[in-house]
Amino acid sequence: MKRLIPVVSALALIAGTASAENIKVGVSPGEHAEIMEEVAKIAEPMGLNIDVVEFSDYVVPNQALADGDIEANSFQHEPYLDNQVNDRGFALVPVATTITTPMGVYSDSITDMEAFPEGGSMGIPNDPTNGGRALLVLQSLGLITLAEGTGLVPTVLDIVENPKDIRFRELDAAQLPRSLADLDAALINTNYAIASGLNPKEDSIAMESADNPYVNIIVVREGDEEQPWVQPLIDAYHSPEIKAFIDEKYHGTVLTSW
């Protein structure tokens, strides 16, 4: 009988690991990474082991998902995904909404938008959807006027009024916090602001309205929507514990969608 014990133990171990799902979820730095680490804790007792994979930019997570290097990602809003699908042909689909993170205006040299100097430099993200989002924020603040009919993806070429003669510098979104010393102001996505040590509520000089179309999403490969790990991932993310974590940690600068 003693000889059977290791065999039985091994079989038990195999059965245990077979019943658990193991997935990799791609995230960007800041709140997306921080929240997903908490989601992983909630998901583990549900039989889902999440390996959180952090990417430093907005381009690689979708490529990694399309290539099969990860099973899901959680870092982008739907307008960005739509642009990526159209431009790069990714077969990726959203399966759940997560959070909304209003974009903020930050500056090392001024404390309100009225003080923005004539001919000053303004940093905006260089990807179409977040760059367009930044321009829409500036229009809502009265600094520029955009041509009608540009939707959610206007470019600097669509600016029809620029009374302060703002000089736009289009930079990688992750680089904008590090470039503040060289700019009069910049529009920065909340995840990169938080990752760089900025507090959106205290350090921004203006914020995008919370009523915006840029709710973030969990994305999987087309055809994986019914995989057995998808619903536990969503349930863990949409749990009361995660909602409480977000409310307590971000104090209103990150908003839940559920």
Task: Outline where the language-model segments fall.
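Periplasmic-binding protein-like
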Residues: T97-Y106, N130-Q139, I194-W258
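Beta->alpha turn/N-cap motifs
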Residues: G30, E54-Y58, G68, N73-D82, ...
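Short helix-initiation/N-cap motifs at beta->coil->alpha
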Residues: V53-Q63, T150-R178
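Pocket-flanking alpha-helical
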Residues: Y58-G89, G104-Y106, T111, G131, ...
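Ligand-binding "clamshell"
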Residues: N83-V95, D108-I110, D182, L187, ...
